[in-house]
């Protein structure tokens, strides 16, 4: 995985009306490895490292929703996982951040 570009928007932008951090990534070989393929061990280790992820609602809009997304069917993509890790690291640092979006740039 490589970070291709990063930008910080301190005010309203075409991404949001509030400050955001934008990363453009190349997942490389990891693009073919959703969480379902990585297995529950990956998910469990991630939650152990960042327990606050257990509170992320994700698209289910309820605590545990993100964990549910990682475990259901084929799971979710690692770009989406990185989105939640970035949000949680900001929360651990004392910022009340909840907004994130992941998009594929095929």
Go through each PLM region and give its residues.
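Charge-rich, well-structured scaffold segments of protease-associated domains
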Residues: 1-26, 88-106
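Active-site-proximal helix-loop elements at catalytic-domain edges
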Residues: 14-57
């Amino acid at each position: 995985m490589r970070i291709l570009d990063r930008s910080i928007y301190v005010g309203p932008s075409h991404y949001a009306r509030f400050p955001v951090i934008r990363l453009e990534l190349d997942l490389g070989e990891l693009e073919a490895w959703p969480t379902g393929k990585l297995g529950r061990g990956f998910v469990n280790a991630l939650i152990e490292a960042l327990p606050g992820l257990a509170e992320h609602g994700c698209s289910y809009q309820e605590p545990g929703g993100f964990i549910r997304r990682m475990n259901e069917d084929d799971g979710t993509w690692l770009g989406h996982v990185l989105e939640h890790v970035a949000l949680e690291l900001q929360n651990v640092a004392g910022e009340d951040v909840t907004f994130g979006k992941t998009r594929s740039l095929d």
